[in-house]
Amino acid sequence: MKMVAPWTRFYSHSCCLCCHVRTGTILLGVWYLIINAVVLLILLSALADPNQYHFSGSELGGEFEFMDDANMCIAIAISLLMILICAMATYGAYKQHAAWIIPFFCYQIFDFALNTLVAITVLVYPNSIQEYIRQLPPSFPYRDDIMSVNPTCLVLIILLFIGILLTLKGYLISCVWSCYRYINGRNSSDVLVYVTSNDTTVLLPPYDDATAVPSTAKEPPPPYVSA
């Protein structure tokens, strides 16, 4: 039998050094659920009252609208899908249904891949940052201050920020995956114990039945008498 050290067991089943991976997955799912619910409320209010979030072309520095109705509907659909995925992950971690966590885990992988592509783009094309900042509207907060920063320092700052963000996202992915493995392992062990207990009950009869003399046993032959 393989022995596992207590600290190894605690590390593999814990996150943030303070809570279980199952609890951490539930909290992470609730956090994402709240964020997407707030985004959905903002989008619905903007769809109900377009003038509240309307920006003219002069404010945006171009001849285009901030967001039309088609893009608004797509954003609302994405928010609803994210709410469903986060709710499934929260419910799956709470009720210990490992399959319900898979969609949220796939979303984390997709988000991590997108951020990695952004980091690679910044690293390969550092001048694209300056071009992107120039395209921002003049009323954008701290636009002039960002433009005045040394381009090399700006690239390093952005890469450092993306690196920290990727590290955090990678750790959260490992926590969700550990929760999935924990629930799968626990369900498998419960099934194994159930099957083993049933087999033991069938194979081992009660002690009284095993030691009792059956009523159909043959009587011993009569004693031998010599002639």
From Swiss-Prot:
This protein's membrane topology, according to the annotation, is:
Multi-pass membrane protein
Keyword annotations from UniProtKB, A to Z: Cell membrane, Cell projection, Endosome, Lysosome, Membrane, Transmembrane, Transmembrane helix, Transport, Ubl conjugation
Location in or out of the cell: Endomembrane system; Late endosome membrane; Cell membrane; Cell projection
Keyword hit for Ubl conjugation: yes
Q: Which cysteines are joined by disulfide bonds?
A: none
- Ranges annotated as spanning the membrane: 26-46, 72-92, 100-120, 153-173
Molecular function GO labels: ceramide binding; kinase binding; phosphatidylinositol bisphosphate binding; ubiquitin protein ligase binding
UniProt region (Required for NEDD4 interaction), positions on chain? 205-222
Q: How is it modified after translation?
A: Undergoes proteolytic cleavage following delivery to the lysosomes.
Q: Kindly give the InterPro entries that the UniProt entry links to this protein.
A: LAPTM4/5, LAPTM_transporter
- Gene Ontology terms describing biological process: endosome organization; endosome transport via multivesicular body sorting pathway; negative regulation of lysosomal protein catabolic process; negative regulation of transforming growth factor beta1 production; regulation of lysosomal membrane permeability; regulation of lysosome organization
Chief subcellular site?
Answer: membrane
Q: Which GO terms describe its cellular component?
A: cell projection; early endosome; endosome; late endosome membrane; lysosomal membrane; lysosome; multivesicular body membrane; multivesicular body, internal vesicle
Q: How does it assemble?
A: Homooligomer; upon reaching the lysosomes. Interacts with MCOLN1. Interacts with NEDD4; may play a role in the lysosomal sorting of LAPTM4B; enhances HGS association with NEDD4; mediates inhibition of EGFR degradation. Interacts with PIP5K1C; promotes SNX5 association with LAPTM4B; kinase activity of PIP5K1C is required; interaction is regulated by phosphatidylinositol 4,5-bisphosphate generated by PIP5K1C. Interacts with HGS; promotes HGS ubiquitination. Interacts with SNX5.
Could you say which protein family the record assigns here? Answer: Belongs to the LAPTM4/LAPTM5 transporter family.
PANTHER family, per the entry: LYSOSOMAL-ASSOCIATED TRANSMEMBRANE PROTEIN, LYSOSOMAL-ASSOCIATED TRANSMEMBRANE PROTEIN 4B
Its biological function? Required for optimal lysosomal function. Blocks EGF-stimulated EGFR intraluminal sorting and degradation. Conversely by binding with the phosphatidylinositol 4,5-bisphosphate, regulates its PIP5K1C interaction, inhibits HGS ubiquitination and relieves LAPTM4B inhibition of EGFR degradation. Recruits SLC3A2 and SLC7A5 (the Leu transporter) to the lysosome, promoting entry of leucine and other essential amino acid (EAA) into the lysosome, stimulating activation of proton-transporting vacuolar (V)-ATPase protein pump (V-ATPase) and hence mTORC1 activation.
Q: What is this protein called?
A: Lysosomal-associated transmembrane protein 4B
Please report the organism this UniProt entry assigns to the protein. Mus musculus
